Amino acid sequence: MIIKPKIRGFICTTAHPAGCEANVREQIAYVKSRGELKNGPKKVLVIGASTGYGLASRINAAFGSGAATIGVFFEKPGSEAKTGSAGWYNSAGFDKAAKEEGLYAKSVNGDAFSNECRQTVIDLIKQDLGQIDMVVYSLASPVRKMPETGEVVRSALKPIGEPYKSVALDTNKDVLVEAVVEPANEQEIADTVKVMGGQDWQLWMDALEEAGVLADNVQAVAYSYIGTDLTWPIYWHGTLGKAKEDLDRAALAIDQKLKAKGGAAYVAVLKSVVTQASSAIPVMPLYISIVFKIMKAQGIHEGCIEQIQRLFATKLYSGTAPDTDEKHRLRLDDWELRDDVQNTCREIWAQINDNNINELTDYLGYKAEFLRLFGFGLQGVDYEADLSGEVKFDVVELV
């Protein structure tokens, strides 16, 4: 079939296998261009490894420091006549590139919240790697099936206390609209913390520790976003912020346990990027379009792969203990939060309208980046080619 993008809401329902592979190879090339990370990790588990920051972490570990990697994700394979998910094709592309270089790469496709998935990963580590020296936790899921009860809990993207009203971008019609989001109730807040907070990360770390598969000096990191006053009402001061605060709590608890073996756990606060997760949050597409324009003009723009390369090289594996903020977090959002960047952001925000959106923001860049997530718009890819949606690779299927 000839595969074209089909957009529904903030999701692209198709993905291009060759385009996704090309996207992965571009990221690999960037990591290699930065040189080898001499004292980087060697045996790495990435939970949430198929897109965005998780995929970028797996690529940096493997191609920046020659690490053996195990990636966990929940993705959909394709068939002859139907495309799979972008994360499936990304992971297949990663697997192929890793094998070409003789790097160990195993993938587990299943529910990362389940005890079965944890046990499968532990067995794999024991069998193939013995122990791991890094754990990356990068899950972005709207639902969590509780491992003990089977209860399905859903997260909510909502403000707390009062309705949220703001200008936002309708990315289907390319016009500005007023977004109105009603506030969350107590149950929705609690459920969002259960799904997107630090509880599951702790379950993973406890299970890995009890199984004896964490090496001395193991580094554990989970990813977060704080943002600015433009996004706080819907994000940091909303249900998601409560979940991310719980991630901070978990990091301190995990860090205390890992200290005994010379290890450490951190939350890394990252910059805003175009991901399948961020495109679902009202206001983020508009904010990202503005901040991209400013940061590109100043030569400080980063995508997922650049952010994680900087995290590894300058924070986690620089050879010295990394600087943290007052909450023990690693801050990679430092360039985005510079006063000059944010002040310009606010100025543009105040004057934005349907007529000047492409002039004042990088909305065209945002849209191109969004399509790239699904393998569309990459150089050197024949988008008129007749392709099968079926791509096989070395993956343990728990689905």
From Swiss-Prot:
Keywords for this entry? Fatty acid biosynthesis, Fatty acid metabolism, Lipid biosynthesis, Lipid metabolism, NAD, Oxidoreductase
What is a single Pfam family found in this protein's UniProt entry? Answer: Eno-Rase_FAD_bd
Enzyme Commission number(s) of this protein: 1.3.1.9
What reaction is this protein's catalytic activity?
A: a 2,3-saturated acyl-[ACP] + NAD(+) = a (2E)-enoyl-[ACP] + NADH + H(+)
Where does the record place the site Plays an important role in discriminating NADH against NADPH? 75
Biological process (GO) annotations?
A: fatty acid biosynthetic process
Coiled-coil residues: none
Give, as in the UniProt entry, the pathway in which the protein acts: Lipid metabolism; fatty acid biosynthesis
GO: which molecular function terms?
enoyl-[acyl-carrier-protein] reductase (NADH) activity; NAD binding; trans-2-enoyl-CoA reductase (NADH) activity
Quote the catalytic residue positions. 235
Is Electron transport included in the keywords of this UniProt record?
A: no
Q: Which top EC class applies here?
A: oxidoreductase
**Residue positions binding substrate:** 225
The residues listed in the UniProt record as binding NAD(+), with positions renumbered to this chain, are 48-53, 74-75, 111-112, 139-140, 244, 273-275
Q: Which family does it belong to?
A: Belongs to the TER reductase family.
Q: What does this protein do?
A: Involved in the final reduction of the elongation cycle of fatty acid synthesis (FAS II). Catalyzes the reduction of a carbon-carbon double bond in an enoyl moiety that is covalently linked to an acyl carrier protein (ACP).
Could you describe the subunit structure of this protein? Monomer.
**NCBIfam families, A to Z:** EnoyACPredFabV, PRK13656.1
Q: What is this protein called?
A: Enoyl-[acyl-carrier-protein] reductase [NADH]
Provenance organism: Serratia proteamaculans (strain 568)
